[in-house]
């Protein structure tokens, strides 16, 4: 069974993230969306909330599992009994960062493989940071995130 782990903060999940999940689910037997827990970072949503939001928007994709993790990604891969990291790339700067991370992960565990998917053209401009910024200024985020979670984001932003 070919299992890939798609790690990220997903704060919040965007249409770009969802596109990579859907496409990854067609390539791999199973995709584990790994929601990063970093106690030193300030998130809009707690990790448990991010997990629930992702579950909501992926409920119709049978071969997707959502889990949270902290610590080293290579250790989480072992826990999941896989060696494959799935990453989405939007820009050249994403590539440079992921290229470095792939080498670091390979250094930590030589069996680790990183598979990169190019973002769909319609999603290249979307990031979680952009979504939060647009929402904070009262902009329309309907083309940026799944419709099912717009109210969650807007109510959290407007606290």
Swiss-Prot record:
User: Where does this protein hold substrate?
Assistant: 9, 41, 73, 87
**Listed GO biological process terms:** coenzyme A biosynthetic process
Q: In which pathway does it act?
A: Cofactor biosynthesis; coenzyme A biosynthesis; CoA from (R)-pantothenate: step 4/5
Query: What cofactor is this protein dependent on?
Result: Mg(2+)
Predominant localisation class: cytoplasm
Give residue numbers for the site Transition state stabilizer.
Answer: 17
EC id: 2.7.7.3
- Provide the protein's localization: Cytoplasm
On the tree of life, the source organism's domain of life is Bacteria
Give me the residues that bind ATP, please: 9-10, 17, 88-90, 98, 123-129
Write down any Gene Ontology CC term: cytoplasm
Any GO MF annotation of the entry? pantetheine-phosphate adenylyltransferase activity
Per UniProt, which keywords does this protein have?
A: ATP-binding, Coenzyme A biosynthesis, Cytoplasm, Magnesium, Nucleotide-binding, Nucleotidyltransferase, Transferase
Q: Which InterPro entries match?
A: Cyt_trans-like, PPAT, Rossmann-like_a/b/a_fold
Q: Which reaction does it catalyse?
A: (R)-4'-phosphopantetheine + ATP + H(+) = 3'-dephospho-CoA + diphosphate
UniProt family annotation: Belongs to the bacterial CoaD family.
Q: Which NCBIfam families match?
A: coaD_prev_kdtB, cyt_tran_rel
What is annotated about its quaternary structure and interactions?
Homohexamer.
Functional note: Reversibly transfers an adenylyl group from ATP to 4'-phosphopantetheine, yielding dephospho-CoA (dPCoA) and pyrophosphate.
Record's protein name:
Phosphopantetheine adenylyltransferase
Q: Which gene encodes it?
A: coaD
């Amino acid at each position: 069974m070919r299992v890939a782990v798609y790690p990220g903060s997903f704060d919040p999940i965007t249409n770009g993230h969802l596109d990579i999940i859907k496409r990854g689910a067609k390539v791999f037997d199973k995709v584990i969306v790994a929601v990063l827990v970093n106690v030193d970072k300030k998130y809009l949503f707690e990790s448990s909330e991010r997990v629930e939001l992702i579950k909501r928007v992926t409920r119709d994709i049978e071969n997707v599992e959502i889990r949270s993790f902290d610590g080293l990604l290579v250790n989480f891969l072992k826990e999941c009994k896989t060696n494959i990291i799935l990453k989405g790339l939007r820009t050249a700067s994403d590539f440079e960062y992921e290229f470095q991370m792939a080498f670091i992960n390979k250094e930590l565990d030589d069996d680790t493989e990183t598979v990169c998917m190019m973002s769909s053209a319609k999603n290249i401009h979307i990031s979680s940071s952009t979504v939060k910024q647009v929402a904070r200024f009262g902009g329309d985020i309907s083309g940026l995130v799944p419709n099912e979670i717009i109210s969650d984001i807007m109510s959290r932003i407007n606290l």
